[in-house]
């Protein structure tokens, strides 16, 4: 492999190995940027050489009819032993949504809430990375990431209802204004050393810092009562570094292994209007992976052992420091027969730890108007085990995969909601109160005939949930997706997407059936490309049913997502 291709390989490895550093929304431009890199590396042969400036990249500009703008740029500089890559993306959007929430209680009373939500969103991401190879087998890398989000939400609500005896409840009016800024900074330092006979040694230090101030002003009044103004300010500070060392062996007679040690710290502080919450974690994760490959057989397994310390200080007399020692396992076996058939069987055991939001013990205004949230510091991790089998057929015109998975989750962290009659708000918290299991079938395929291609997918799931806040009856979910595409003369490409979701059932709520339809057209003009999207043509209402011990809540959302998106890209 030439030196140039080696640099490209390192760039691709960066996108994979440092996803936590460069975690950004997947958008059209990132797919364009990937095609830029693919143009230089085809079948291990250099198909196109950059010009004498050693500079190449691209830019994308898009805008939608409902008030969204999405400019992005990507540039790479390559010369001798130096590779410099930078990416910048900006997203401005505005969305108006109407929502009706109906709550029926077992006591016989009911509440109706009508809300209009206006959301303004500004997002900016920047990342740059420098790779330097002083000599063969040694690569030094440094990188920085900066991300800034600003979200402003204005909600206006009218609340009505009836008491259990049929009397009309006094109407309540509420206006809520929420503003939060989210600044994330990251830094990466990495060194890779290749040994001729042993393999590759990778060391990495990743630093992340998050600053997120949130301001919420909620003004509530009744038709014949005084107004009540509630003001809340919350600021989050989070420093989250980790250090990693990994040894990857070369392949000997089909065998290879890797050993990794990763140490992570998280130091978080949340200052609210009247409270302070400190959330500190320490983790030591050891991973051992082994793999064997043969002409018709491939085996691999990864064993992980983690010592995890969760230290919570809510400035109360109770002690909330917890120590966990957990093991996780992933195994997979793949059998191939012929050039077209492949069968894979996998077993996975994993841990899901509660988030800081679920642990935060103080009552605060939630992300939705009329909802209060309080965490639970007694939450424990949930454990899951999954067994999955899949079959893949790959032909010249048709590729399809069928999979069947069974998953069992214990000590599930489930959401529980209740209604506070005094504040006229729903109060949401979390409990380790449930076990659930599901059986999931998926079929996915791609059909190719000349200029026509179509990708399709079907998913079905049977869920059995056993929690104190919801019934344990079996519940089915299913969905179907199709994406036909055709290439026309003069470099035109047309595609459409159809998505049908049946009654989509989750652990304690379900969504009604819906049909979504979008259309896309692309025109290629040498280094330019023109894009046009018609998004969410049908724009269906979204209905959700949530069941708890003492109430059933129905939410009807009327989004304003139908729009025309136009854009262009340029690569050099």
How would you label these PLM feature ranges?
Residues 101-109, 157-167, 218-227, 273-278, ...:
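Flexible, surface-exposed loop regions and adjacent strand-edge segments
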Residues 458-465, 475-524, 538:
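C-terminal beta-barrel architecture of Gram-negative outer-membrane proteins
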Residues 230-236, 240-242, 376, 380, ...:
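Outer membrane beta-barrel strand-and-loop segments of large Gram-negative receptors
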Residues 8-16:
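Bacterial N-terminal signal peptides
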Residues 17-160, 174-212, 237-239, 245-259, ...:
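Membrane-proximal, glycine/serine-rich, low-complexity loop/turn segments characteristic
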Residues 59-60, 111-116, 169-177, 225-233, ...:
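Extracellular loop and loop/strand-boundary signature of outer-membrane beta-barrel proteins
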Residues 54-57, 98, 124-126, 258-265, ...:
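Surface-exposed extracellular loop regions of Gram-negative outer-membrane beta-barrel proteins
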């Amino acid at each position: 492999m030439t030196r140039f291709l080696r640099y490209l390989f390192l760039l691709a490895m960066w996108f994979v190995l440092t996803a936590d550093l460069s975690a950004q929304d997947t958008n059209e431009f990132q797919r364009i940027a990937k095609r830029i890199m693919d143009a230089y590396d085809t079948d291990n042969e250099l198909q196109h050489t950059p010009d004498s400036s050693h500079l190449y990249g691209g830019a994308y500009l898009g805008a939608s009819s409902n008030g969204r703008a999405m400019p992005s740029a990507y540039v790479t500089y390559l010369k001798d032993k130096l590779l410099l890559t930078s990416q910048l993306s900006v997203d401005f959007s505005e969305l108006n949504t109407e929502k009706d929430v109906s709550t029926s209680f077992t006591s016989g009373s009911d509440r109706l809430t009508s809300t209009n939500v206006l959301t303004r969103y500004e997002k900016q991401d920047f990342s740059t990375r420098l790779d330097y190879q002083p000599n063969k087998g040694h690569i030094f890398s440094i990188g920085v990431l900066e991300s800034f989000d600003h979200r402003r939400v204005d909600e206006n609500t009218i609340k009505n209802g009836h008491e259990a005896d049929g009397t009309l409840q006094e109407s309540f009016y509420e206006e809520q204004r929420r503003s939060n800024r989210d600044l994330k900074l990251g830094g990466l330092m990495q060194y890779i050393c290749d040994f001729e006979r042993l393999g590759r040694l990778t060391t990495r230090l990743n630093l992340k810092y998050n600053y997120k101030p949130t301001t919420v002003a909620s003004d509530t009044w009744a038709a014949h009562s005084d107004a009540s103004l509630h003001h809340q300010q919350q600021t989050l500070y989070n420093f989250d570094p980790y250090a990693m060392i990994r040894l990857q062996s070369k392949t000997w007679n089909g065998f290879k292994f890797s050993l990794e040690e990763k140490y992570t710290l998280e130091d978080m502080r949340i200052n609210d209007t009247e409270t302070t919450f400190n959330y500190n974690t320490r983790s030591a994760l050891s991973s051992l992976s082994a793999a064997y490959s043969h002409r018709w057989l491939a085996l691999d397994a990864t064993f992980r052992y983690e010592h995890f310390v969760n230290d919570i200080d809510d400035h109360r007399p109770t002690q909330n420091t917890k120590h966990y020692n957990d093991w996780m396992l992933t195994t997979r076996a793949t059998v191939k027969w012929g050039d077209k058939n492949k069968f894979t069987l996998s077993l996975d055991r994993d841990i899901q730890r509660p988030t800081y939001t679920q642990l935060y013990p103080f009552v605060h205004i939630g992300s939705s108007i009329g909802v209060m949230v309080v965490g639970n510091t007694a939450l424990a991790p949930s454990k899951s085990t999954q067994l999955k089998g899949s079959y893949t057929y790959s032909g010249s015109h048709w590729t399809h995969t069928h999979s069947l998975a069974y998953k069992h989750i214990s000590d599930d962290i489930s959401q529980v909601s209740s209604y506070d009659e005094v504040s006229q708000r729903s109060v949401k918290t979390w409990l380790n109160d449930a076990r659930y299991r599901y059986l999931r079938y998926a079929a996915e395929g791609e059909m190719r005939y000349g200029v026509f291609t179509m990708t399709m997918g079907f998913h079905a799931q049977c869920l059995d949930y056993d929690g104190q806040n919801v019934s344990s009856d079996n519940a089915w979910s299913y969905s179907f997706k199709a994406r036909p595409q055709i290439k026309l003369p003069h470099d035109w490409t047309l595609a459409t997407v159809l998505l049908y979701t049946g009654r989509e059932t989750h652990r304690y709520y379900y969504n009604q059936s819906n049909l979504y339809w979008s259309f896309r057209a692309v025109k290629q003009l040498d280094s330019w490309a023109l894009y046009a999207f018609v998004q969410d043509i049908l724009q269906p209402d979204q209905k959700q049913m949530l069941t708890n011990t003492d109430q059933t809540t129905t939410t009807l959302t009327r989004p304003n997502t139908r729009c025309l998106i136009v854009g262009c890209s340029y690569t050099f």
